[in-house]
């Protein structure tokens, strides 16, 4: 609540969404300070930088529905790693199938080692194209925890940073929506996402 009142959630987002319209530099300085105080909370708080990807590649309707929630304190995660896809994200197999009946995408599969896996909003890398086995078959999806369909099957036993849960997630017909265009999930969106994440991780490391 204190961070929200200070305007430090979604601080790089435009003011019309509840942000401060700050550049990335003040955000990284804040990430350093927060990590120095509490590394676990720093992990949870800093994953708000996922909203940068949604802001850059999502549509206007997604902006209006999701960005204010992050500015008001809701949490985010990026769901990339799987049991058989870690550093090689081209091997991601979590399946995304469009349901004409439901009018949305349904996600099925397992994600592993997901930092802040119990977050409110998730950016999920999933395989949307039949027959494609490499990165060109992957798209980015937005999953809202309020929709249900995802269970936290395991919380990892780590040596430190226990305040930030690292989870194994099971997706079972979880309703989601496409972020941006199909097939650009890895080659464009994850690359942009990770560029911002590296700055945040570097700032946390300095703080620690």
Which residues does each predicted region cover?
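A short, Trp-centered hydrophobic/proline-enriched beta-strand micro-motif
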Residues: 72-80
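A glycine-rich, basic-preceded beta-loop-alpha segment at the flavin cofactor/substrate interface
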Residues: 146-149, 153, 165-197
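Extended amphipathic alpha-helical segments enriched in small hydrophobics
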Residues: 198-208
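Short beta-strand elements
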Residues: 91-98, 125-126, 169, 173
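Internal helix-loop-helix
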Residues: 2-72, 114-117, 201
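Short Gly/Pro-enriched turn/cap motifs at secondary-structure boundaries
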Residues: 84-87, 113-116, 132, 158-165
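A short core secondary-structure module
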Residues: 104-150
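Flexible, glycine/threonine-enriched loop-and-boundary segments that flank and lead into catalytic domains
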Residues: 1-13, 79-101, 106-112, 116-121
């Amino acid at each position: 609540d204190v961070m929200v009142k200070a305007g430090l959630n979604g601080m790089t987002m435009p003011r019309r969404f509840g942000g401060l319209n700050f550049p990335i530099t003040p955000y990284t300085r804040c990430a350093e300070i927060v990590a120095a105080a509490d590394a676990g909370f720093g992990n949870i708080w800093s994953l708000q930088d996922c909203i940068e990807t949604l802001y850059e590649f999502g549509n206007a309707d997604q902006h209006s529905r999701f960005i204010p929630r992050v500015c008001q304190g809701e949490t985010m995660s990026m769901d990339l790693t799987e049991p058989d896809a870690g550093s090689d994200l081209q091997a991601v197999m979590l399946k995304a199938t469009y349901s004409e009946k439901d009018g949305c995408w349904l996600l099925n599969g397992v994600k592993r080692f997901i930092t802040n896996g119990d977050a409110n909003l998730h950016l999920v890398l999933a395989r949307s194209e039949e027959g494609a086995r490499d990165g060109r078959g992957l798209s980015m999806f937005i999953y809202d925890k309020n929709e249900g369909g995802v269970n936290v099957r395991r919380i990892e036993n780590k040596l430190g940073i226990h305040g930030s849960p690292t989870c194994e997630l099971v997706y079972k017909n979880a309703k989601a929506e496409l972020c941006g265009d199909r097939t650009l999930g890895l080659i464009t969106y994850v690359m942009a996402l990770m560029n911002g994440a590296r700055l945040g991780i570097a700032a946390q490391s300095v703080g620690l």
